[in-house]
Amino acid sequence: MTDHDERTFVMVKPDGVQRGLIGDIVTRLETKGLKMVGGKFMRIDEELAHEHYAEHEDKPFFDGLVSFITSGPVFAMVWEGADATRQVRQLMGATDAQDAAPGTIRGDYGNDLGHNLIHGSDHEDEGANEREIALFFDDDELVDWDRDASAWVYEDLADHD
Ligand code: DAT
Ligand code: MG
């Protein structure tokens, strides 16, 4: 049986919020068949920004990254589905929005490396999804629910013959 309940952390960054793209980005993930299990409209403070981007601490762009991510509200989310972490990365597109393929979120809406609209956990960094979810959400902020459409997304959940 396929594991349908992998969870991943996703965030609409301040540029996406300011440009009114929360709805479009959520729609992309919903229509792919992923299920939202948590969502929080919030501001990231310095401390959380440092923790979230700890892997980039030594990079020359770190200070700019922290000041960007704390510059306005973000929409933090947890999404669930089969292979969810990698699936979200594919929907996001390449880090530099100018290189991101048309059809991806960054490719369709972005034009910049820093202002690239969306964060998603790195599927090549084992456990990054669980770490980031725990950093942003308490367990009781995540909702277990059955999305009826899942049986029409995943064939192995279907009850037809
Ligand atoms: P991603 O957001 O695709 O996971 P990442 O984790 O390598 O990319 O980097 C985190 C963010 O930092 C990225 O969304 C944009 C910014 N960034 C990455 N590389 C950069 C660079 N060389 N110069 C400036 N900003 C950069
Ligand atoms: Mg990353």
Curated annotation (Swiss-Prot):
Gene it is expressed from: ndk
Entry-linked InterPro entries: NDK-like_dom, NDK-like_dom_sf, Nucleoside_diP_kinase
Family according to the record: Belongs to the NDK family.
Protein name as it appears in the record: Nucleoside diphosphate kinase
Residues given in the record as ATP binding sites: 13, 61, 89, 95, 106, 116
Entry's Gene Ontology BP terms: CTP biosynthetic process; GTP biosynthetic process; UTP biosynthetic process
Active site annotation, chain numbering: 119
Natural source organism: Halobacterium salinarum (strain ATCC 700922 / JCM 11081 / NRC-1) (Halobacterium halobium)
A single cellular component GO annotation: cytoplasm
